């Protein structure tokens, strides 16, 4: 959201709650006043080799969720190549534990275990991902849109006590009518962001240099989400250490999706960067492989609802 120039994610709990009551939405990051012990706990996990402990991950995640005062919470727990949890069974175990914690704290909870073997959308990088999110709110159909509508269906049904069919219909109508895009603009404006960028993607620029990545062979395309994420980060699109400045214009745009049939030499992606880093570009190229047989994973592996 900080791709919107001036956007303030550092809201206090009071500011967050007030904005939600006023306009129906807010986006905030973790601040020093929000679960301040969590960073210390993570530091302890780091030096005791317990970073991947499922109970400690669950307590860390849920401490922040419960501090938000939300009475209905939906969790999207990723698994796969680009996720912290590689195996779907481990992701589901984590999801069930977090749902249990939330319910014991009196919250209505649900969770979806979803696949991140390859990128969810067609874009990687701050400005590029915001552009794609805006496109979805304008009606673009892709996996990002499918998963977003799935989440809307489940969360609205749980929060409002309506059927999932009605919840989905309301979500689809909000996109078709332009209400969803208008709500994003309200949130951006309320938090000090440049609302013009919601309607003008040129205000969310991509980096000045572009390298085309081509298929290394003929067959079905296989894409590593982890390799692309690391490449984007190394090119400046993410922080490699605390205090690093993020270049919001760095981007990787997919021209073909995982599982698509491709011919050797066919363009499969574009990498946008301002500072050339050979290792990062090599990582991006290496993220694309071709195989003769490709088994797509379901977008949603499992769902833990109110009855589970």
Name each region found by the language model.
Residues 2-68:
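Phosphate/pyrophosphate-binding betaalpha-module
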Residues 50-53, 57, 64-308:
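Well-ordered secondary-structure scaffolds
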């Amino acid at each position: 959201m900080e791709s919107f120039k001036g956007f303030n994610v550092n809201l206090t709990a009071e500011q967050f709650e007030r904005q939600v009551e006023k306009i129906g939405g807010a986006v905030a990051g973790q601040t020093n006043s929000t679960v301040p012990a969590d960073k210390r706990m993570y530091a302890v996990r780091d030096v005791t080799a317990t970073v991947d402990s499922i109970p400690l991950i669950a307590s860390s995640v849920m401490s922040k969720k419960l501090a938000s005062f939300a009475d209905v919470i939906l969790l999207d727990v990723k698994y796969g190549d680009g996720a912290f949890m590689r195996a779907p069974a481990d992701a589901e175990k984590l999801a069930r534990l977090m749902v249990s914690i939330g319910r014991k704290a009196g919250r209505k909870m649900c969770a979806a275990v979803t696949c991140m073997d390859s990128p969810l959308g067609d874009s990687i990088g701050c400005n590029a991902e915001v552009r794609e999110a805006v496109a979805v709110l304008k009606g673009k159909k892709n996996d990002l849109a499918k998963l977003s509508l799935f989440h809307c269906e489940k969360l609205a049904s749980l929060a409002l006590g309506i059927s999932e069919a009605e919840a989905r219909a309301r979500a689809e109508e909000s996109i078709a009518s332009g209400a969803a895009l208008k709500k994003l603009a309200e949130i951006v404006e309320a938090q000090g962001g440049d609302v013009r960028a919601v309607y003008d993607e040129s205000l969310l620029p991509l980096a000045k240099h572009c390298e085309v990545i081509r298929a290394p062979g003929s067959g079905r395309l296989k894409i590593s989400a982890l390799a692309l994420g690391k490449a984007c980060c190394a090119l400046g699109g993410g922080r490699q250490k605390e205090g690093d400045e993020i270049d919001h214009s760095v981007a990787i745009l997919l021209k073909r999706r995982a599982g698509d049939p491709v011919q050797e030499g066919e363009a499969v992606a574009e990498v946008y960067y301002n500072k050339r880093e050979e290792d990062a570009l090599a990582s991006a190229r290496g993220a694309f492989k071709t195989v003769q047989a490709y088994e797509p994973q379901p977008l949603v592996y499992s769902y833990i609802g109110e009855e589970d």
